[in-house]
Amino acid sequence: MGKKKRSASSSRWLNEHFKDPFVQKAHKQKLRSRAYFKLDEIQQSDRLFKHGMTVVDLGAAPGGWSQYAIRQIGDLGRVIACDILEMDPIVGVDFLQGDFRDENVLQALLERVGEKKVDVVMSDMAPNFSGMPAVDIPRAMYLVELALDMCKQVLATNGCFVVKVFQGEGFDDYLKEIRSLFNTVKVRKPEASRGRSREVYIVAMGYMG
């Protein structure tokens, strides 16, 4: 019985996915994912990226955000990306495959960043969801806490942080912490984000270091 439910749910999700206008648009424009349009909408509102910037992309695969960022920052810019999943190469993107929660992977990522601070840290990380919010939300919050820890280590003064967060237990405290570290903080729900999803994007600008 449970198997049939999962199958029906999966079929419904796939049907919605392929009918999604942003999925169709991404496919037509040969983009890595619909997430490209989420970041584009944020950029139109908040102007995070400029030519020559250095950007860290956490949870990068399949590469929609890295693809967008490198187009914004140009040949003189640099994207350092990390994901537990494989990602096809993108010109200008330095990709590290590994689990960001692993200390060795984190150290390898920090080595790639180097001593110079970065301009933007962005995270589209999400756990594998079980369908049980009591399990999924803490897992998701753990990942966004790690992303914020990364900011504290590598983000330059006045730098920006963009992070996908799932609303639920811990969200308000997390938002409060970000507001204590950045001059300007917005909570965005891009049009390309599915309406019934708990996800929102915290856009934080003016890191106080």
From Swiss-Prot:
Keywords: Cytoplasm, Methyltransferase, rRNA processing, S-adenosyl-L-methionine, Transferase. S-adenosyl-L-methionine binds at residues 63, 65, 83, 99, 124. The active site is at residue 164. InterPro entries: RNA_methyltr_RlmE, RNA_MeTrfase_FtsJ_dom, rRNA-MeTfrase_E, rRNA_MeTrfase_gammaproteobac, SAM-dependent_MTases_sf. One of its GO terms (molecular function) is rRNA (uridine-2'-O-)-methyltransferase activity. SUPFAM superfamilies: S-adenosyl-L-methionine-dependent methyltransferases. Residues 191-209 form the TRAM domain. Transmembrane segments: none annotated. GO terms for cellular component: cytoplasm. Its main location: cytoplasm. The keyword S-adenosyl-L-methionine applies. It is found in: Cytoplasm. Specifically methylates the uridine in position 2552 of 23S rRNA at the 2'-O position of the ribose in the fully assembled 50S ribosomal subunit. NCBIfam families: PRK11188.1 (NF008390), rrmJ (TIGR00438). This is Ribosomal RNA large subunit methyltransferase E. It comes from Histophilus somni (strain 129Pt) (Haemophilus somnus). The gene is rlmE.
